């Protein structure tokens, strides 16, 4: 039996992350990562010896990409859903990252009890974007995309509790929730330092924001040039090709 067959379960696929030969296990009918995860992994940065945590990690796609892009020695992927955490663990084993990346199948509000208060240098998070309302019939997808098990306020509070003074939080979120994001960050002593607005296509309204916040920092926000994903004809922009290592 090959390593691939031994790690895959029924109804699962092994997908290419298009970076450093990384692969990820996903369920055909469950939650799957999308472009926003790749954008966040490319937007954030860390030093090799930083303690790094990915919250709301899902199948650990951001954690694995960010870990490898920044050559980090030790990291943690936090995911509350058992099946997603299990898939993440098996993806980590497939990519031989088990000595550097650990999965914590836990509520993010309790993670400080495991890792310690103010013990983390860098956090990434691709949180559930949608407030509770009409959700998917698939519980796994609903929890991953809607604020059922957690919400923006709890995520920012937990991040602030985990981060050291001077530690950084990198977040991707819906652009229409930017005001709430900024409010929650500043309320929890996480100063927004860098903002990049993401447009799905030239001529279209933005749909995502990438934000860097720093714990205990002085005020002062840098707004980077817009990130446009697709040209008017629907083709990928050169920058998106570079992010996906296609150029």
Segments from the language model and where they lie:
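Conserved Class I SAM-dependent methyltransferase catalytic core
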Residues: 150-206, 210
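Class I SAM-dependent transferase core
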Residues: 5-47
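General small-molecule cofactor/ligand-binding pocket signal
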Residues: 25, 102-104, 193-196
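Conserved SAM/SAH cofactor-binding pocket of Class I
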Residues: 43-136
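SAM/dcSAM-binding transferase cores
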Residues: 204-247
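Residue-level signal for inorganic ion chemistry
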Residues: 40, 126, 155, 213
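Mobile active-site "lid"/loop adjacent to the S-adenosyl-L-methionine
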Residues: 127-154
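Short glycine/threonine-rich catalytic loop with a Thr-x-Gly-x-Asp
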Residues: 31-33, 59, 203
């Amino acid at each position: 039996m090959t390593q691939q067959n031994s790690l895959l379960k029924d109804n699962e696929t092994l997908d290419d992350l298009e970076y450093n030969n990384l692969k990820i296990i996903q369920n055909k009918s469950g939650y799957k990562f999308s472009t926003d995860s790749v954008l966040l992994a490319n937007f954030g940065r860390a030093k090799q010896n930083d303690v790094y945590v990915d919250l709301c990690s899902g199948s650990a796609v951001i954690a694995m990409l960010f870990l490898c892009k920044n050559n980090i020695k030790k990291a943690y992927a936090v995911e509350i859903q058992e099946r997603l955490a299990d898939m993440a663990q098996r993806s980590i084993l497939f990519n031989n990252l088990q000595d550097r990346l650990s999965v914590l199948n836990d509520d993010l509000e309790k993670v400080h009890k495991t890792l310690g208060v103010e013990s983390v240098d860098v956090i990434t998070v691709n949180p559930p974007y949608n407030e509770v309302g009409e959700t998917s019939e698939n519980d796994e997808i609903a929890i991953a995309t809607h604020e059922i098990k957690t919400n923006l306020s709890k995520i920012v509070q937990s991040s602030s509790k985990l981060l050291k003074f001077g530690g950084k939080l990198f977040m991707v979120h819906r652009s229409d929730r930017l005001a709430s994001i900024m409010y929650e960050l500043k309320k929890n002593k996480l100063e927004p330092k860098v903002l990049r607005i993401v447009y799905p296509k030239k001529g279209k309204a933005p749909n995502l924001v990438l934000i860097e916040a720093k714990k205990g920092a002085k005020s002062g926000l840098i707004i980077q040039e817009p990130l446009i994903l697709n040209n008017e004809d629907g083709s990928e922009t050169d920058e998106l090709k570079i992010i996906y290592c296609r150029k």
